[in-house]
């Protein structure tokens, strides 16, 4: 029999409200509507299907404050993560959000009405307190960054009524709700279920870890990966799910089931481990594996861990009686080549030879095409990963040239395009500053905001082309560091980004200006001209610095080609 839900009752709002579906659907069409973001949709889905039981809606101020300060809802029930609906003042005014108001919550992807929210309160959270108490306060933490840079200033609390399930078009057969997963366990006759949380591909060590956990507790295994929002830079869930499906036959027949969890992770370490345990309990699991640095985001820019390696295990141990799910702490598994087996690191005698491949090393091997040994992963898993990670010679990249008007960046970009076309193997796209201004950003001016929008558009287009394996050459002025960095972050989701500072002096750019643009700017005929009456922020960390005053275009292009070659991007075989 599946474990009882957190709080004793599964708050399956979809099942509860299905008799009123026609009535609620009609009302939803008449109410003011709020389009939810991707993260809000993840939260809503687990609120509607009972994954966040005992919650029946987004947290009110009383619940929110209790969770932030004490891991407690107003009822006294244990809950460790704030589940909130953030809005801005304009939305409050537009939708007349106040206690008693009813609004429709809508999917931004297809305008589908999903739920009706009855507002209980609208409040301004103490974000600094939330950042400190829930996530540890480090400003580099992904969740803290989200709080300050993305989340709106106000939260809306209230109860939900379900109108429709969210529509999914991928791996639908694996997207079990808590009720469906519980029924599946009952059908299989499983009395004990060990749940395994992951946001990464699984390899031999993970298979060994989960089988050991099942063996020691006479249980079966629920592989329960997150397919909502995870850490930026993680391998996409499409690839990961194909990996899990490839791995499943490696378990003894009937031992393991794969189910997908549409969770938006916060990377909250100890707090998140408690939350994950509650979610798995609601899905019927009796046991939950908590490993080293569970749900931690790794290290900050100074190389300091956001959390201690076993903080998450200590946190769930503290609340184990209340959680009502047995936590299975596990050390990292490592390979012993002399005996051809895996073992937990804390059980390996001193002097025994071990081997391991880190996530960073694995990604490097995938990018370079180097061998991934069979002791580390199964051939069928590696095959899936390689399908999503082509060799370097087939990966896209972006060359982003920045510098003053008439610095030579356009000539360099054109010459580089010709050189790469001669090389072959990839399509090559060229985005010169004036071309982009004419074709993509004709309505934009030259205020800082408009300049940043222009670079954001270039970054978006470059990222999509990079993802599809193209070579992209962009040569805008791009005077501001933050906009350039944002473009880098967009592109680096899918491939390499190389920032080339064309550091030709302003004096030389002006002296050799045959079009007379600088002269017009000096005369006041052109306003907001970079280098004259608008600033240029030199790149802090360019990949390459060149100067068209002292170097020929040919030699600069050769330097860029050598840079690309050194990264394996121009290998033909």
UniProtKB/Swiss-Prot annotation:
Family stated for the protein in its record: In the N-terminal section; belongs to the sulfate adenylyltransferase family.
Site (Transition state stabilizer) residue list: 203, 206
EC number from the UniProt entry: 2.7.7.4
UniProt entry keywords in alphabetical sequence: Allosteric enzyme, Amino-acid biosynthesis, ATP-binding, Cysteine biosynthesis, Cytoplasm, Methionine biosynthesis, Nucleotide-binding, Nucleotidyltransferase, Transferase
Assembly information from the UniProt record: Homohexamer. Dimer of trimers.
Region called Allosteric regulation domain, residue ranges: 395-573
Listed GO biological process terms: cysteine biosynthetic process; hydrogen sulfide biosynthetic process; methionine biosynthetic process; sulfate assimilation via adenylyl sulfate reduction; sulfate assimilation, phosphoadenylyl sulfate reduction by phosphoadenylyl-sulfate reductase (thioredoxin)
Enzyme active site: 198, 199, 200
Site (Induces change in substrate recognition on ATP binding): 330
InterPro entries linked: APS_kinase, ATP-Sase_PUA-like_dom, P-loop_NTPase, PUA-like_sf, Rossmann-like_a/b/a_fold, Sulf_adenylyltr_euk, Sulf_AdTrans/APS_kinase, Sulfurylase_cat_dom
Binding site for 3'-phosphoadenylyl sulfate: 434-437, 451, 477-478, 515
Protein name: Sulfate adenylyltransferase
GO cellular component: cytoplasm
The gene coding this protein: MET3
């Amino acid at each position: 029999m599946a474990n009882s839900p957190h709080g004793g009752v599964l708050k399956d709002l979809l099942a509860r409200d299905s008799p009123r579906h026609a009535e609620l659907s009609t009302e939803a069409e008449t109410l003011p509507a709020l389009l939810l973001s991707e993260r809000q949709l993840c939260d809503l889905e687990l609120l509607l299907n009972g994954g966040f039981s005992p919650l029946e809606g987004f947290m009110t101020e009383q619940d929110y404050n209790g969770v932030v300060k004490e891991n407690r809802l107003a009822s006294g029930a244990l809950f460790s993560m704030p589940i909130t609906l953030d809005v801005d003042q304009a939305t409050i005014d537009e939708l007349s959000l106040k206690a008693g108001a009813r609004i429709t919550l809508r999917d931004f992807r297809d305008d589908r009405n999903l739920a009706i929210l009855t507002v209980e309160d609208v409040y301004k959270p103490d974000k600094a307190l939330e950042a400190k108490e829930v996530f540890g306060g480090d400003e580099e933490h992904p969740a803290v960054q989200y709080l300050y840079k993305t989340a709106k200033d106000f939260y809306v609390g209230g109860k939900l009524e379900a109108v429709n399930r969210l529509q999914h078009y991928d791996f639908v057969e694996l997207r079990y709700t808590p009720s469906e997963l519980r029924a599946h366990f009952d059908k299989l006759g499983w009395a004990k279920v060990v749940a395994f949380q992951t946001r990464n591909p699984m390899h031999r060590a993970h298979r060994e870890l989960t089988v050991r956990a099942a063996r020691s507790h006479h249980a079966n295994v629920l592989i329960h990966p997150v397919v909502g929002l995870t850490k930026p830079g993680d391998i996409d869930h499409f690839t990961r799910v194909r990996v899990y499906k490839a791995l499943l036959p490696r378990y003894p027949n009937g031992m393991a089931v794969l189910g997908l969890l549409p969770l938006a992770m916060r990377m909250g370490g100890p707090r998140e481990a408690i939350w994950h345990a509650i979610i798995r309990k609601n899905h019927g699991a009796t046991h939950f594996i908590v490993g080293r640095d569970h749900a931690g985001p790794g290290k900050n820019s100074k190389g300091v861990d956001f959390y201690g390696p076993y903080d998450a295990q200590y946190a769930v141990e503290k609340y184990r009686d209340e959680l009502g799910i047995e936590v299975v702490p596990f050390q990292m598994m490592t390979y012993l080549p002399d005996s051809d087996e895996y073992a937990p690191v804390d059980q390996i005698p001193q002097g025994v030879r071990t081997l391991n491949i880190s996530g960073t090393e694995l990604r490097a091997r995938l990018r370079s095409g180097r061998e991934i040994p069979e002791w580390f992963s199964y051939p069928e898993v590696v095959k899936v990963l390689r399908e999503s990670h082509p060799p370097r010679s087939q990966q896209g990249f972006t060359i982003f040239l920045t510098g003053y008007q008439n610095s030579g960046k356009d000539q360099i970009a054109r010459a580089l395009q010709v050189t790469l076309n001669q090389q072959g193997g990839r399509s090559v796209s060229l985005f010169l500053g004036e071309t982009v201004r004419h074709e993509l950003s004709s309505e934009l001016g030259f205020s800082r905001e408009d300049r940043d929008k222009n670079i954001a558009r270039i970054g978006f287009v470059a990222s999509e082309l990079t993802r599809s394996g193209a070579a992209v050459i962009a040569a805008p002025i791009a005077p501001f560091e933050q906009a350039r960095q944002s473009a880098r972050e967009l592109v680096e989701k899918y491939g390499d980004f190389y920032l080339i500072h064309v550091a030709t002096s302003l004096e030389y750019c002006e002296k050799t200006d045959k079009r007379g643009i600088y002269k017009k700017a000096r005369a006041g005929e052109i306003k907001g001209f970079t280098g004259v009456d608008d600033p240029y922020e030199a790149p802090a960390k360019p990949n390459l610095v060149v100067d068209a005053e002292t170097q020929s275009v040919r030699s600069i292009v050769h330097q860029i080609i050598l840079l690309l070659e050194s990264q394996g991007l121009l290998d033909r075989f």
